[in-house]
Amino acid sequence: MKKLKELTSLLFLFCCLCFCLILFPQTARAGSLTPTAQDNLKVRLRRTSDLIPVSGGYMRVFHQKNSVGVEYYDNDLKIRSKRKINMELPLWGGFYAGSDGYYLVEGQTNNKENDSAEVIRVIRYDTNWNRNGAAAITSNPELFGGEIRTPFDYGCVEMTESNGKLYVVTGHEGYVDSSVGQGHQGFLMAEIDQATMKGKIVSCDLWHSFAQYIKSHGSYLYVLEQSEGSRCTKLSRYDSNTLDCTTIELLPYGGSHTSVWALACYASVDGMAVSSDSVLCVGTSIDQSKYDKVSENTPHNLYLSVTPMSDFSEKATTTRKLTNFTGEGKSFAGVKITKINDNRFMISWEEYVSDDNKKNSSANDPLSSSTLHYLFVDGKGKSLSKEFTTAAPISDCQPVVKDSRVVYYASNSNTLNFYSINSDNGKADKKTYHIAGDNATWNFKNGILTISGYGPLSIS
């Protein structure tokens, strides 16, 4: 009750100060700079937030309504500069830091079902964010599933490079099927020649692809996919020279198709990474042998599958559970796998907890009510550590590695936390920004709320 009263008082004071600061703006202090608030606590198929190691620190990239925010931080995660890149098309796809610059993927709907209409644009920038090329992707009616009505539909937007080509995997909705009154959803992979910036669709289907990830290693591309239509989580290997494809089943789903409509999978596909000799994939699932008896008490568990590159087969693939819940309808708010080096990976997750059962957050850190779980495995998926926990949420941001630290950020509308985990011993630290507006910060200590900065407040 005391905590509730403190937070209620805090909100009341925020509202009062918002009115005061609008009427009586203060003068900005020299050198003051405030990060941009962006709620990224929900883990999405299409990431809206990225963090990239750069010389001297980190670059934060995040999607806003019609633009992309870019902020630079030093190695101590102190903000140094910020800018905005206007989007060229209305649909956000994703961001990728390539070997030859930065890429933004954007799109637009094709409701007129015009085969020659641009539906996806892959825009390249140099490392100073000067635009220096773009590839236009159109439908390819010669391929099954190559007709695009809505790009990115119920899909990720993930990218990798191989042999001078950029590959993008995502989902899409095809042209309307008159027999059902809507288009079917499926997998889509596009290839962009980085020298000419010419792009095309190279693989696609209409088999209800609900998550897609891609990595490259040697002469192969590895694609992890949640294929509801195939009733399994599947892993495909493409020869990057010929695009010949071999696919194996990692996790079969229960149920069977009796119509064109999607069936529940009771599973998620959350990420993949490659070591020097194996492909590691993470996801969650119920016990699929109990599919027909699923209830609100049926738990999900976190699993890790490992497929050796030298024997790319279902028989050689091993799968093990990383959690062992048996009831209470346990589920997950998000799962990530982060490559530290070829023989060390961090798997992190947050278990779903109802608002009624969450622990109280501190008044000075609204994000501290969540619990992040993480552990380390080697390149063959064997455990290297115990399971660690820290007061932090999972977020939309994929963790990155710099100077033996795994770093990511989480943010709501008024707090931005950078979390840093020592990749050797698992110790976690954080740096917090309290954001009260574009040029204002807040702090709550000893029952006193302090607002610093100038201009209007933005409080949610």
Predicted regions and their residues:
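Positively charged n-region of N-terminal signal peptides that target proteins for export
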Residues: 1-6
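Bacterial N-terminal signal peptides
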Residues: 11-22
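Sec-dependent signal peptide cleavage junction
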Residues: 21-32
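N-terminal capping/linker segments that flank leucine-rich repeat
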Residues: 28-30, 430-460
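Extracellular, repeat-based ectodomains that mediate carbohydrate processing or recognition
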Residues: 31-429
